[in-house]
UniProtKB/Swiss-Prot annotation:
Single GO term (MF): structural constituent of ribosome
Protein name per its UniProtKB record: Small ribosomal subunit protein uS4c
Any single Gene Ontology cellular-component annotation: small ribosomal subunit
Organism lineage string: Eukaryota, Viridiplantae, Streptophyta, Embryophyta, Tracheophyta
Main location: plastid
Location of the S4 RNA-binding domain: 89-150
Name of a matching Pfam family: Ribosomal_S4
Function: One of the primary rRNA binding proteins, it binds directly to 16S rRNA where it nucleates assembly of the body of the 30S subunit.
Signal peptide range in chain numbering: none
Record's keyword annotation contains Acyltransferase: no
Length: 196
């Protein structure tokens, strides 16, 4: 199954807020969730919705998500917590959380087009796993800096998670440590994803 490129507001109406997918919000009067889906929710549907939230927020394919679940299952810690840590430490997500891009697909495009450096080297793989003490910067040319400048100016510095620091003047970010569960930018029950 390929990456989702369809209407984003439909997914937000169905699944709730997904800040990584888009900044848009549906109109307050158009609550289709209540209109069509009233009544008792089945357990399967609840688990499926949680999995879809995770997929659409981080922009993953089904196969990529399965791979991350298998890696998290082999870890000694809680599988759900390790899964979220793996997803949050992806390069495209770190670029998004630093405010260098307005959405995760936008951050993925910056990485694919070779505008982002990790520890002074160009990395063009969005799924690159960042480690603590990695330094994320933009390329030292005018075009790369202009692309990131607009996003940094419009981002809210209060939403920056505690495991990241950003220097807006030099377009530089630092991964200080691995993320805690409470700083994940998505309201999700990760145990339901693992059960699915």
């Amino acid at each position: 199954m390929s990456r989702y490129r369809g209407p984003r507001l439909k997914k937000i109406r169905r699944l709730g807020a997904l800040p990584g997918l888009t900044r848009k919000t549906p109109k307050s009067g158009s609550n289709l969730k209540k209109k069509f889906h009233s009544g008792k929710k089945e357990q399967y549907r609840i688990r499926l919705q949680e999995k879809q939230k995770l997929r659409f927020h981080y922009g993953l394919t089904e196969r990529q998500l399965l791979r991350y679940v298998h890696i998290a299952g082999k870890a000694k810690k809680s599988t759900g917590q390790v899964l979220l840590q793996l997803l949050e430490m992806r390069l495209d997500n770190i670029v998004f959380r630093l405010g260098m891009a307005s959405t995760i697909p936008g951050a993925r495009q910056l990485v694919n087009h070779r505008h982002i450096l990790v520890n002074g080297r160009i990395v063009d793989i969005p799924s690159f796993r960042c480690k603590p003490r990695d330094i994320i910067t933009t390329k030292d040319n005018q075009r790369s800096k202009r692309l990131v400048q607009n996003s940094i100016a419009s981002s809210d510095p209060g939403k920056l998670p505690k495991h990241l620091t950003v220097d807006t003047l030099q377009y530089k970010g630092l991964v200080q440590k691995i993320l805690d569960r409470k700083w994940v930018g998505l309201k999700i029950n990760e145990l339901l994803v693992v059960e699915y």
